[in-house]
Each structure stands twice: as C-alpha cells, then as structure tokens.
A protein has these predicted regions:
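Long, hydrophobic/aromatic-enriched structural stretches that serve as scaffold segments
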Residues: 19-82
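Residue-level recognition of alpha-helical structural elements
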Residues: 35, 58-61, 65, 90, ...
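Acidic/His-rich structured neighborhood in mature extracellular/periplasmic domains
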Residues: 82, 93-103
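Predominantly late transmembrane helices and immediately cytosolic-facing juxtamembrane segments
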Residues: 83-88
Length: 259
C-alpha cells in the first residue's frame, strides 16, 4: 500500500528504473564472449529485480523488497568484478563467468539425479541421464582441473571461494549493509521478529503502509553506483541523463530515510 507521503519517492523510483531500462533497450546486444555482453546480462537482471522491488513496495511488502535489495548489491559487486577484469584484459575471468551458468546447471542436474539414484539405484531413466550428464561434466572438470562437479562453488568463476571474499576485493566491500539485507533473507531471529513497518502492534499477516524508506535507499544507492561504473566503460548503457536521474533518486531517498 502507498500512503500519500510515499507517492513522490515511488514515482521517482519508477521513473529512474524506466529511464534505465529504456536506455538499455537501445544498446545493440550480441550473444558473444565479450565483457560488453556479460555486463548487459547482469545489469538487465538488476533492472528486472528493481521492477520487482518497486512492485513489492507499492503493494505493501517492504521486508520482501529488502531481501531483493541484497540481490542488487550482489549484482553491483559482480559488475565491479567484471569491469576490473575488463581493465586487465582478463579473458580467462570472462570465459569462466560465461561458463558458470552452464556448469551450475550441470551441478544442479547432477545433484537431482544423484538423489534419485540414492533412493532407487535401479532407476534406468536416471542412470541413462547420468551417463549423458557425465560426458558434459567431464568437459568442464577437465577444462578447469576440478575433481568433481560439486567442487564448483557459486562464485568460483571470480577466483574467490565465496561471495564475501569477492566483495572484499571490490570497490564496494561487504559490510554492515549486507548484514542488514541478509537479515531479511535468512529465517533467523531478526528476520522473524523485526519488521521494517513497526507502526502497528502485533504480527503483520498482509500488506503494510510503512517501511519503504530503507529499501528505497538501498535500491537507489546500488543502482546509482552500478550505473556510474558502467558509464566509465560503456556510456551507451548508462548515459549521463540516466545517471543524473539516479543521482537525484539516491539523494532524495537518503533524505527520505532521515524523516
């Protein structure tokens, strides 16, 4: 739900994301092994996530929007890592990043089939699928000198064995902000008991009126930072007009947070 005082900020959020999406749709995209294509993929996902955050906020679900803000931060760190690789002309980093989705899909399929065979070792369909899967798996385990498919961790492509280590090497190190965002993702004590909207006593079982300040500020910050570093390399993706609008959004979201 949106109360009267939220309307200007929500409108600025919508306007900023729409301007960002419109600029990106004008960029020529070819599916190829380039940093340009890699950045387009991550940034486009970031804008789609921003649309989801807007939808959750306008319908009164700030805590769920906050959880998605963590995805924006993770996207920002990935973009920063890729752009640093571009500066170094690191073709191996790029290739690992582009191979990662295929490898992660193989890992998921392997775990699913392993589970099926564990419960029914005579499952002929699972056996035949596993045999075909093994051929694809060997191609990547040999290429990257891994013993097993499950040796590929989620952020292996970055050269670090965890997101935290990758973030610490970026210009946007993981700190208290990421911890606050994680509290809205993990079902821990904070996630269960602390709500962004605390205007009403009791446990909310539906949409709420308040709690939009923090998600708006996080979203504005991560979008502005991403657009800024992308503009340094690919100004056509994030033109100055978009950066100016995101800067305004970030400044006003910061002021809105202090109210």
């Amino acid at each position: 739900m949106v109360v009267q005082e939220d309307i200007p900020m929500m409108e600025l959020f919508r306007k900023s994301v729409n301007a960002s999406r419109e600029a990106l749709t004008k960029v020529e995209v070819r599916e190829e092994l380039t940093y340009h294509y890699a950045i387009v993929r991550v940034y486009s996902k970031m804008l789609v996530t921003s649309c989801a955050i807007y939808t959750l906020l306008i319908n009164g679900y700030p805590d769920d929007a906050m959880a998605l803000c963590r995805q924006l931060y993770e996207s920002l760190v990935i973009i920063d890592t890729l752009l640093k690789g571009k500066q170094k002309n690191d073709t191996e980093l790029l290739e690992r990043f582009m191979d990662a989705p295929v490898i992660m899909a193989l890992r998921d399929d392997y775990e699913t089939l392993s589970y099926a065979l564990k419960h029914d070792p005579n499952d002929q369909y699972a056996k035949s699928q596993m045999k075909m899967l093994d051929q694809e798996i060997q191609k990547y385990t040999q290429k990257y000198q891994k013993d097993r498919i499950d040796a590929f961790k989620d952020y292996w492509w970055s050269g670090y064995d965890s997101f935290g280590k990758m973030a610490q090497q970026s210009d946007f190190p993981k700190g208290y902000m990421y911890s606050l965002l994680s509290d809205k993702v993990h079902m821990n004590a904070l996630g269960a008991f602390l709500y962004l909207d605390n205007s009403e006593p009791g446990i909310p079982l539906g949409d709420v009126d308040g709690g939009k300040q923090q998600p708006l500020w996080y979203a504005s910050l991560f979008l502005y930072c991403s657009a800024g570093i992308i503009n340094d390399h690919y100004p056509e993706m994030c033109p100055q007009s978009v950066i100016d609008l995101l800067k305004q959004f970030s400044i006003e979201a910061s002021m809105y947070m202090k109210k």
